[in-house]
């Protein structure tokens, strides 16, 4: 079975490894090298690094719409194109090239959380369950029929980074299972997505990291988890902007205005929200690194606590 693999970030690497064990990967498509780091040097994607290490041919077009790129893809004669977090839109002209079409590994239980940031949006919304889907691609955004899926609970204190790593491995396993069935002549039966329950996971933005104490504590705690490891939640704490790496929601009755520091100890800094309180457990001052609450309090002896 001849497969073209298309993917870019860390999430796609386990799936690439899985495909190489099941089929002949004739080419890997990934996004062009991007400037990164303080020196803004061009850096290859994680998928490119993995592909090069395995001796696989790598292609990095800006778009898949040009006649030259389409002809290149046709010349590869793929039986199947596998797409995992590629980040480049596949036009209909590409979808019709392989005999078995194009498969996509998506990090949610479709139709919930179609789009670019399904992991973060699931945690932000307080979802208790998510999963991965193997989808037959069509022209719409994550609208294709689902071939297979796997479910998993979202742990109470799980961050986006932690869930990302679990779902990446689950997606690789699901893809392996699907390819195994296809090779055996038992092609998974496509199931159309339900018309109800559709939600969209729009791309994360840096501006979203700023938390508002006028929100319930439970919602803010979910956002802290959702924004790890990026963009990292930010708050204003007694006049200082700090980043929050870990926090807990407290079901606490109080009569103080949102943003008021209710208590401060080595266990955490409890801040009044419009409903409940948010306990800050791990913080980062501007220009510094993430530190414990105890270390932060040693540096902020001016912190005003109002019972």
Curated annotation (Swiss-Prot):
(6S)-5,6,7,8-tetrahydrofolate binds at residues 108-111. GO terms for molecular function: methionyl-tRNA formyltransferase activity. One of its GO terms (cellular component) is cytosol. It comes from the Bacteria. Keywords: Protein biosynthesis, Transferase. It catalyses: L-methionyl-tRNA(fMet) + (6R)-10-formyltetrahydrofolate = N-formyl-L-methionyl-tRNA(fMet) + (6S)-5,6,7,8-tetrahydrofolate + H(+). It holds the Pfam family Formyl_trans_N. Its EC number is 2.1.2.9. Belongs to the Fmt family. PANTHER family: METHIONYL-TRNA FORMYLTRANSFERASE, METHIONYL-TRNA FORMYLTRANSFERASE, MITOCHONDRIAL. Attaches a formyl group to the free amino group of methionyl-tRNA(fMet). The formyl group appears to play a dual role in the initiator identity of N-formylmethionyl-tRNA by promoting its recognition by IF2 and preventing the misappropriation of this tRNA by the elongation apparatus. HAMAP family: Formyl_trans (MF_00182). This is Methionyl-tRNA formyltransferase. It comes from Xylella fastidiosa (strain Temecula1 / ATCC 700964).
């Amino acid at each position: 079975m001849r497969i073209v693999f298309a993917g870019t970030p860390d999430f796609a690497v386990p799936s690439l490894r899985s495909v190489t064990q099941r089929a002949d990967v004739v080419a890997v498509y990934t996004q062009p090298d991007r400037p990164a780091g303080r020196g803004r040097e061009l850096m290859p994607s994680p998928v490119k690094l993995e592909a090069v290490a395995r001796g696989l041919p790598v292609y990095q077009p800006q778009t898949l719409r040009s006649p030259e790129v389409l002809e290149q893809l046709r010349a590869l004669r793929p039986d199947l194109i596998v797409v995992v977090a590629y980040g480049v839109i596949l036009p209909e002209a590409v979808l019709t090239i392989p005999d078995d079409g194009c498969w996509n590994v998506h990090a949610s239980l479709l139709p919930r959380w179609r789009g670019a940031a399904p992991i973060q949006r699931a945690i932000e919304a307080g979802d208790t369950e998510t999963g991965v889907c193997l989808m037959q691609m069509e022209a719409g955004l994550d609208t294709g029929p689902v071939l297979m899926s796997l479910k998993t609970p979202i742990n109470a204190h799980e961050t986006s980074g932690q869930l990302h790593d679990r779902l990446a491995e689950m997606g690789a396993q699901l893809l392996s299972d699907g390819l195994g069935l296809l090779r055996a002549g038992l092609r998974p039966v496509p199931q159309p997505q339900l018309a109800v329950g559709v939600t969209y996971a729009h791309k994360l933005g840096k501006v979203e990291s700023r938390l508002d104490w006028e929100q319930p504590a439970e919602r803010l705690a979910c956002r802290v988890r959702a924004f790890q490891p990026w963009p990292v939640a930010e708050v204003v704490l007694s006049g200082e902007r700090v980043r929050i790496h870990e926090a807990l929601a407290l079901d606490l009755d109080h009569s103080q205005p949102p943003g008021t520091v209710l208590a401060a100890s080595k266990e955490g800094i409890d801040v009044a929200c419009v409903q409940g309180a948010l306990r800050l457990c791990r913080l980062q001052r501007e220009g510094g690194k993430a530190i414990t609450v105890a270390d932060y309090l040693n540096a902020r002896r001016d912190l005003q606590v109002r019972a």
